[in-house]
Amino acid sequence: MYLINQNGWIEVICGSMFSGKSEELIRRVRRTQFAKQHAIVFKPCIDNRYSEEDVVSHNGLKVKAVPVSASKDIFEHITEEMDVIAIDEVQFFDGDIVEVVQVLANRGYRVIVAGLDQDFRGLPFGQVPQLMAIAEHVTKLQAVCSACGSPASRTQRLIDGEPAAFDDPIILVGASESYEPRCRHXHAVPTNKDK
């Protein structure tokens, strides 16, 4: 990262599932703690895959988190001694998350968000594209395609081992039982003629 003389900015960590987004968010939070900065981590209540009160990476790293139902609930937990606000699975938050993140950065907090930039269909997911547009720093991570070994920028949803259809519900919380990382060429979404 670059030397920043002003307090308050936004960092977005994005990519497909299994690309290391939560792991990178945890790493950045731990670095702030080593620097004696005060950090707080948030996650949406819907994300209960591994834990209800921790952000947990697929490889088992974890950090304590405050689960919240709505974006604006984040404000209730912020205190003046905080330096860093981290938010995992940001794609699951409501539309107010962009305003919340902007307000926090404008108040002088370093705001780190992590989330999927594309849904299982390969389309922009939730508010992540807007957050990427207003962020000072964007880190786009890639996984390894489970079909061919190429860099994977997409998330393949599987239902009984087969690709999910384009019109299936967007949100289905899951892990390796429901999703695989895929490259552009090995990603399939039935009924979508562009894929």
Swiss-Prot record:
Gene this chain is encoded by: tdk
GO annotation, biological process: DNA biosynthetic process; thymidine metabolic process
One GO CC term, this protein: cytosol
Family statement: Belongs to the thymidine kinase family.
Name of this protein: Thymidine kinase
Locations listed in the record: Cytoplasm
Catalytic activity: thymidine + ATP = dTMP + ADP + H(+)
Active-site residues per Swiss-Prot or TrEMBL entry: E89 (proton acceptor)
Organism: Bacillus cereus (strain ATCC 10987 / NRS 248)
